[in-house]
Amino acid sequence: MQPSKVNKHRIIFHIDMNCFYASVEMAHNPSLKGKPLAIAGNPEERKGIIVTSSYEARGKGVKTTMPIWQAKKLCPDLILMRPNFDRYRAASREIFKMLAEITPYVQPVSIDEGYMDITDTIYAKDPLVTANQLQQRILSGLDIPCSIGIAPNKFLAKMASDMKKPLGITVLRKREVEKLLWPMSVEEMYGIGEKTAQKLNSIEIKTIGDLAKKNVYELKQLLGVNGERLQNRANGIDNRLVDPEAVHDFKSIGSSQTLPHDSTDVTELMQLIHELVDNVERRVKRKEAAGKTVQITIRYHDRKTITRSKKLYNYIDNHREILFVAKELFEQHWNEAPVRLLGVSLQDMETKRNIGEQLDLFTYEAIEKKEKLKVTVDKLTKKYGSNIITSQKNKNESQENQQPRTSFQKDFLDDYKKP
């Protein structure tokens, strides 16, 4: 399917589920409603961080990424629950099915938010009625609240959906940008993170209005092409299309995990890298693809984040090769400070069908032999379990039966993609 068309009169919705994980848990167990609830990585040990929380908890000062001990100090009666990703995934599928019944132009951007373009549908006659009906259908069918932004482009729709929560419906017209958006601080603008905001502040840009009116040359000097792009958004200009196929495109496959506590334990960190590589390999195989660049992400206890990558001569797709490069990068660039999050990704992706056309005979024969062995191993693993075959290196290590920890948002998008 082609993306939605470009014209000046499009009707774009941005649908954002309110406190999604917490809302799903409350729908599953209504006795939790009206109580301060937080989803956290490791509530038993009180060393994890808050993944998300209900509005009741937020009212007491509980915030995402806050350590559990700090959240409990602010809100002693806080109810803590581990995440149930299967439950969240199932709820998300049902929500996006409802959106797809209105228009084929639906673009998910994460498990709990997405865009839809209703311009060329019968629902375009009264967008507010359509938004209200959709909101009520999700609430009555799944007991999950959402906010909806309605605007002529994706950026304004996203900004609109953030204006009223929970259960808000907001229309934001381009002519209202100066009145409604320009007084807001740049930190509140979608697409601007903490570091970008600091850079903008350094050249006296404090509000969205300041950004909209700044000399574009200065912005490009500071932020490159992104400077002009952000200025366009600040002026309400965004020509991106709602593209249902965008979820099918991929240039990288990655997995990341926040640790239950800040760690300097090399054994623990290496074990996590193993698990992340396991997950990357599984998803790479599912796509029948390979990549030429391995990247690691390290986020420290103070939230400072670094990414380091290594470009390879040949495409790789298996655990051993990805792990070798990931460990090498980690050992070279970790400064031994406590680590809060690790990530591994394989980038510069290409399908094996396309890669095959680039291989010479000798390379192909070597890969073919390796592939035959790996197919046999995969079949045995599938039939008898992951413990049937272990490498000589790992034969004395304990094998874990649990699913590797994953970057859940990317897994969700994989689910949404058509086979």
Swiss-Prot record:
Residues 12-193 form the UmuC domain. It comes from the Bacteria. The active site is at residue 113. Residues 388-419 are annotated as: Disordered. Disulfide bonds: none annotated. GO terms for cellular component: cytosol. Pfam families: IMS, IMS_C, IMS_HHH. Its cofactor is Mg(2+). PROSITE patterns: UMUC. The record marks 21 as: Substrate discrimination. It is found in: Cytoplasm. It catalyses: DNA(n) + a 2'-deoxyribonucleoside 5'-triphosphate = DNA(n+1) + diphosphate. Mg(2+) binds at residues 16, 112. Binds 2 magnesium ions per subunit. Belongs to the DNA polymerase type-Y family. Monomer. This is DNA polymerase IV. It comes from Oceanobacillus iheyensis (strain DSM 14371 / CIP 107618 / JCM 11309 / KCTC 3954 / HTE831). The lineage of its organism: Bacteria, Bacillati, Bacillota, Bacilli, Bacillales.
